[in-house]
Amino acid sequence: MEEAHNMREISIREIVVNHAVLSSCIDKCGDCFASEAARIKFDNDIEAIFELKRKRNAVILAHNYQTPEIFHGVADIVGDSLALARKAIDVDADVIVLAGVHFMAETAKLLNPEKTVLIPDREAGCSLAESITPEDVALLRQAHPGIPIVTYVNTSAAVKAASDICCTSGNAKKVVEALGVPKVLMIPDEYLARNVAKETEVQIISWHGHCEVHELFSASDILQLRENHPGVTVLAHPECPPDVVAAADFAGSTAAMSDYVTTKQPKRVVLLTECSMSDNIAVHHPDVEFISSCNLCPHMKRITLANIRTALEENRHEVTVDAKIADPARRAVERMLAI
């Protein structure tokens, strides 16, 4: 999914709070609209962010897992990791605010070294990115000499720098096959590697990293969903365990899931991924019933309207990449984008 928003300075609450298909999201919001003061702060944050973007010539890139008030309310560009990486190259702005997790902000910086890149919360990490280090990659090279290393973008810049090429969940199979070799290492997501291996003749050696959101889904969850919601279409992310992917009706990146709903228009659908994904695309599909069966990413949820506003007001927190690793990391990302 890749989409640009040019929002007028209106009350975004009218879009977010009053839209029936986002009621589940507002319910999850807890007490954030429990008082008039909270409502006023919400509107003030929205208005301030628009004014700060104008003053600083800033754009906000938001991942599909961001909450609807960010995704629909203040983001200029939204999408999955691949879409954000591609769009980051063409951003015409002095400042980029990355509403996502740290590896995404690093990727934006790699592709825009001359621009200021901010992440609203420096602690917005990723279990996959934390599952592997550059030292681990070096040991893998020693153990498998001559085997190309395909690295998921959900990694640090330092790990990317130690790799040959990057991939996303949306292009992993394409990247693996484009290398024209019989065997590759795919790191760090074990389940993504195993799921891709089922779709290609290329032999894939995997690492043991897992996404803490997607590893929680099980094939028994799908059986229960089908029993409770007859006729439901089940879409799974390829970071899910292979038995989950096998039991689903379709598996793909968040962009592919969105495209599936748009083109197939299932009457009833469940997305086995992060909760905000369903909330964000439901607004465009009022005739589709979205069944709730999701897991929250605590890292993505560290990004809020309030800390986006603070990031723009105080230039917090600027993302930098060490010069020694920036060039090789950038090459790994650019090789992916060239495919």
From Swiss-Prot:
Its cofactor is [4Fe-4S] cluster. Binds 1 [4Fe-4S] cluster per subunit. It comes from the Bacteria. It is an enzyme of class 2 (transferase). SUPFAM superfamilies: NadA-like. Keywords: 4Fe-4S, Cytoplasm, Iron, Iron-sulfur, Metal-binding, Pyridine nucleotide biosynthesis, Transferase. It catalyses: iminosuccinate + dihydroxyacetone phosphate = quinolinate + phosphate + 2 H2O + H(+). [4Fe-4S] cluster binds at residues 126, 211, 297. GO terms for molecular function: 4 iron, 4 sulfur cluster binding; metal ion binding; quinolinate synthetase A activity. Catalyzes the condensation of iminoaspartate with dihydroxyacetone phosphate to form quinolinate. This is Quinolinate synthase.
